[in-house]
């Protein structure tokens, strides 16, 4: 099933405009859709008690690029209690470019929002001053409207840049307004800047490529072992499917 034919392209899914912007912009750069195994590309399920069963939908969509992108994938979830857009671009390691990471999660009582150029090397080896200044300026503008969430632990923070947007909002009308307006604007600014940098980058030497491979693997292995979405996914789809999804699709190239 094409993701364009699912609920995730409809206005009643919270993140539909974000997903459309992603897919449209990646197509402009001649990215090619990557076939996802059918058991992960679309799934309907139910969760909750026998008396209060609720429906949940999941779709996984991915693309590659012949030179620039190893794998870019979106995981979308829709249910009465949860609405999720998780997106990751894994760039080709012949370019010294960070990951592009999005994790927008609507829980029963709150929204958790993360947007970043996530490093695969130490900050000083992957970000020049001009890029850091641009990111921090965009971040500060976003956080003039969206509150900054609590400080991340050192173990988690090492996988984020100084430009990370990290917010926690209550489930209320004001938050809906902030998501639809400020967050969407910041999301477009970050994605536009990322794709511009990725597609203008020059190839790096073999020594640095090896460092990039190791850095990417460290992050992907960490996420496979410590994915914070694991409990939510297990409660919605069961442990076996969740472990398979994490291992086979979410954090692999």
From Swiss-Prot:
Its EC number is 1.3.7.3. One of its GO terms (molecular function) is phycoerythrobilin:ferredoxin oxidoreductase activity. GO terms for biological process: phytochromobilin biosynthetic process. It is an enzyme of class 1 (oxidoreductase). Keywords: Oxidoreductase. It catalyses: (3Z)-phycoerythrobilin + oxidized 2[4Fe-4S]-[ferredoxin] = 15,16-dihydrobiliverdin + reduced 2[4Fe-4S]-[ferredoxin] + 2 H(+). Belongs to the HY2 family. Catalyzes the two-electron reduction of the C2 and C3(1) diene system of 15,16-dihydrobiliverdin. This is Phycoerythrobilin:ferredoxin oxidoreductase. It comes from Prochlorococcus marinus (strain MIT 9301).
């Amino acid at each position: 099933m094409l993701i364009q034919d699912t609920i995730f392209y409809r206005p009643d899914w919270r993140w539909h405009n974000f997903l459309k912007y992603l897919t449209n912009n990646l197509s402009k750069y001649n990215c090619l859709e990557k076939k996802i195994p059918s058991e992960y590309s679309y799934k309907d399920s139910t969760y909750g008690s026998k008396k209060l069963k609720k429906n949940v939908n999941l779709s996984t969509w991915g693309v590659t690029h012949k030179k620039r992108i190893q794998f870019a994938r979106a995981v979308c979830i829709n249910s009465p209690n949860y609405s999720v857009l998780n997106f990751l671009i894994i760039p080709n390691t012949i370019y010294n470019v960070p990951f592009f990471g999005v994790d927008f999660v609507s829980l029963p009582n709150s929204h958790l929002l993360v947007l970043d150029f996530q490093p695969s090397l130490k900050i000083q080896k992957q970000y020049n001053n001009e890029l850091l200044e641009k990111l921090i300026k965009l971040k500060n503008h976003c956080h003039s409207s969206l509150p900054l969430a609590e400080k991340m632990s050192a173990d988690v923070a090492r996988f984020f840049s100084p430009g990370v947007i990290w917010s926690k909002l209550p489930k209320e009308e004001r938050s809906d307004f902030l998501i639809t307006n400020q967050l969407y604007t910041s999301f477009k600014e970050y994605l536009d800047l990322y794709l511009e940098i990725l597609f203008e980058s020059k190839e790096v030497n073999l020594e640095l490529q090896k460092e990039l491979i190791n850095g990417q693997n460290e992050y992907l292995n960490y996420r496979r072992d410590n994915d914070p979405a694991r409990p939510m996914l297990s409660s919605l789809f069961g442990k076996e499917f969740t472990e398979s999804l994490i291992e086979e699709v979410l954090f692999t190239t």
